[in-house]
Amino acid sequence: MAVTLTPTLTLTSSDITADALSISVTDSLSLGSNDARITRQISPNDVDPGGTQIFDTNLGKSYIYAKNTHATLTIYLAAAADTATGASWMALAPGEFAFFPWAGVVDLFAHSGANGQGVATAGLEYIVFEA
């Protein structure tokens, strides 16, 4: 049985430009009959080579929600087991989140950088919706 996920993004501001900003977009995403929904809260660190793997290519095309729940550390997302922050595709500061499509052709890792600041408490909440 196919299921549907409906993401909505709204951006508003009254002072970022001379004109008021008000953008809202919605989509309807079909997840398919064999979809996997993986929900976890993890402590990504720099001890494991490349951090913690949060997505494996065997899932195929997916939609990923990720939120940095750590109070002080930035969480980096990268498609390779590499804790160099310059190799990261995304950096989520404390409280920041992202929802994005993932082609599923490479793995996805989360880490807190190569500076020895492993996250001792949960720092990344993520959900993978397989398309």
PLM features per residue range, with description:
Residues 1-54:
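N-terminal low-complexity, intrinsically disordered "leader/linker" segments enriched in small/polar
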Residues 2-17, 114-131:
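C-terminal interaction-tip segments
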Residues 47-50, 72-75, 116-121:
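Short, surface-exposed beta-strand/loop "edge" segments at domain boundaries and coil↔beta transitions
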Residues 53-56, 91-107:
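Beta-sandwich interaction modules
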Residues 58-61, 67-88:
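Short, surface-exposed beta-strand/strand-loop-strand elements in extracellular ectodomains
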Residues 66-72, 112-114, 129-131:
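Short, flexible beta-strand-to-coil junctions
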